[in-house]
């Protein structure tokens, strides 16, 4: 009887438990997002964000092919490591669809897709076996600018390319040219990080900047024709001329002075709106511009010029967390990836910081291949407290392997002649013997002697003398800033002292022993 009761109780308990409603089992659904990161050695890096996943896999198929299902992506795809998928062995200049899926122990995520187009390597890039070098770099300012003259023609460019000596013989001058500019006057926007009231340049401004230099009939065409015409007169040079192209800054904020302004103002790449609060998107904008320039260069196909590399426009690179406005600049998170991309194609990354600017001692970490220091001594007028030091300049060059920028100006330096009539002409940084503009308040300065011409010529001579004295002549590279038009103004000046100064500078450039190394 007792055994019978135990049996009945057990059956009752079983039925009671079995009839209770079960709690639903919670299944964590895997979710993933992917975005383009970079191209590298014939492949592509894809950035992954995921939740509730054990692993994420990705693969690429030619655009238009059937999309793979989740099982196939896992079987044939590449597994993400450190939130990054690398898919290699891709053809250049080809459109691909990248597919990715996340897995968990119980299910798959939704398959996600990203369209990419691999960069092309042009014939002149394939044939390049090493990085291009040069002894001297001549700055050619321009772009969509409010400065005058706005456009370059063969007459203006000529004195940058060749010079005629005292005996009437013509000689080749600079080896390389930097195409540089900092504004899009048509859009009233700045290509460079600044704290003024200008709007940050967007993708359209970047295009206009590149087109000014590289489009049909642009400065590249004029420079190429100038070299060809000179070669017909004096024979081909012993070197091939180089060009370095300036890259606009990918400025985080639409209005840099307003730290609440938009970070998504710039434009789209691969159909996606870039957000410059993400350094990866700033890198992507740089790469877009590099590819735009390369494509334009290929179309232009200059006969006498090679594209040597790209230049960082900002003259200060805040790359340490304790630097001023670091959270809005973060160059240490941007430039190394840009440098890596350039190096794949044997392009160099260049920079010219102003005196003691942040970043001058971090160029190796930032991936910068060559740097020229600005001494800024040309503007250390006697009436100003002297703050610039040749000792610092050359100690820095010795420590980091930098070169030096030579600095002088022509009529561009005449702004501020309002004090000329009162006998205080200190505002002129023009090297010219005669005033070329009516920038004084009375509009009467033009044609008058420039009382600071001798001082400014001596400042230019100081650059050359100090460079030699420090042992850098024949050892370190030279860059030259000459304002917007000083080379032409000196070379064509009716004043003998101006022409003498021009030839003195030219001899310093062409007699540099580094040219023979």
Where are these regions (language model features)?
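Eukaryote-skewed repeat-based solenoidal scaffolds used as protein-protein interaction platforms
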Residues: 247-248, 254, 277-403
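Surface-exposed loops/turns
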Residues: 41, 92-93
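Substrate-binding cleft of secreted/luminal carbohydrate-active enzymes
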Residues: 356, 372-383, 389-517
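N-terminal catalytic cores of secreted or lumenal carbohydrate-active enzymes
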Residues: 122-288
């Amino acid at each position: 009887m007792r055994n019978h009761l135990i049996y009945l109780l057990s059956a009752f308990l079983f039925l009671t438990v079995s009839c209770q409603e079960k709690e639903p089992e919670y299944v964590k659904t895997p979710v993933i997002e992917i975005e383009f990161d970079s191209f590298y050695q014939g492949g592509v890096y894809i950035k992954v964000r995921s939740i509730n996943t054990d692993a994420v896999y990705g693969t690429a198929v030619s655009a238009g092919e059937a999309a793979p299902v989740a099982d196939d992506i896992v079987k044939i795809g590449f597994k993400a490591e450190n939130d990054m998928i690398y898919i290699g062995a891709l053809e250049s200049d080809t459109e691909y669809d990248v597919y990715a899926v996340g897995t968990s122990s119980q299910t798959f995520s939704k398959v996600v897709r990203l369209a990419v187009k691999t960069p092309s390597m042009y014939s002149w890039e394939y044939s390049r076996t090493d990085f291009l070098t040069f002894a001297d770099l001549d700055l050619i300012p321009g772009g969509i600018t409010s400065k005058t003259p706005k456009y370059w023609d063969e007459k203006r460019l000529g004195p940058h390319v060749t010079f005629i000596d005292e005996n009437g013989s013509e000689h080749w001058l600079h080896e390389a040219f930097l195409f540089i500019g900092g504004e899009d006057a048509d859009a009233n926007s700045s290509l460079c990080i600044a704290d003024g009231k200008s709007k940050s340049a967007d993708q359209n401004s970047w295009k206009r900047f590149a087109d000014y230099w590289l489009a049909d009939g642009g400065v590249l065409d004029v420079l190429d024709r100038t070299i060809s015409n000179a070669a017909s007169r004096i024979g081909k040079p012993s070197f091939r001329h180089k060009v370095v192209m300036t890259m606009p800054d990918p400025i985080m904020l639409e209005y840099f002075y307003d730290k609440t302004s938009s970070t998504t103002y710039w434009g789209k790449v691969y159909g996606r709106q870039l957000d410059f609060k993400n350094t990866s998107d700033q890198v992507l904008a740089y790469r877009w511009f590099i590819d735009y320039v390369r494509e334009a260069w290929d179309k232009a196909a200059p006969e006498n010029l090679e594209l040597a590399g790209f230049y960082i426009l900002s003259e200060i690179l805040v790359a340490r967390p304790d630097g001023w406005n670091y959270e809005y600049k973060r160059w240490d998170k941007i430039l190394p990836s840009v440098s890596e991309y350039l190096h794949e194609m044997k392009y160099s990354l260049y920079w010219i910081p102003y005196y003691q600017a942040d970043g001058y001692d971090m160029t190796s970490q930032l991936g910068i291949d060559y740097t020229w220091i600005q001494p800024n001594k040309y503007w250390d007028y006697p009436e100003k407290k002297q703050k610039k030091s040749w000792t610092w300049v050359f100690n820095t060059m010795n420590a980091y392997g930098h070169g030096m920028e030579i600095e002088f100006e022509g009529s561009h330096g005449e702004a501020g002649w309002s004090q000329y009539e009162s006998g205080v002409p200190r505002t002129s940084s023009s090297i010219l013997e005669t005033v070329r503009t009516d920038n004084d308040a009375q509009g009467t300065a033009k044609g008058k002697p420039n009382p600071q011409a001798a001082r400014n010529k001596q400042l230019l001579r100081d650059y050359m003398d100090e460079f030699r004295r420090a042992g850098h002549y024949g050892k370190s590279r030279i860059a030259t800033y000459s304002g917007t038009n000083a080379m032409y103004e000196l070379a064509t000046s009716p004043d003998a002292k101006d022409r003498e100064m021009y030839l003195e500078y030219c001899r310093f450039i062409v007699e540099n022993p580094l040219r023979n190394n």
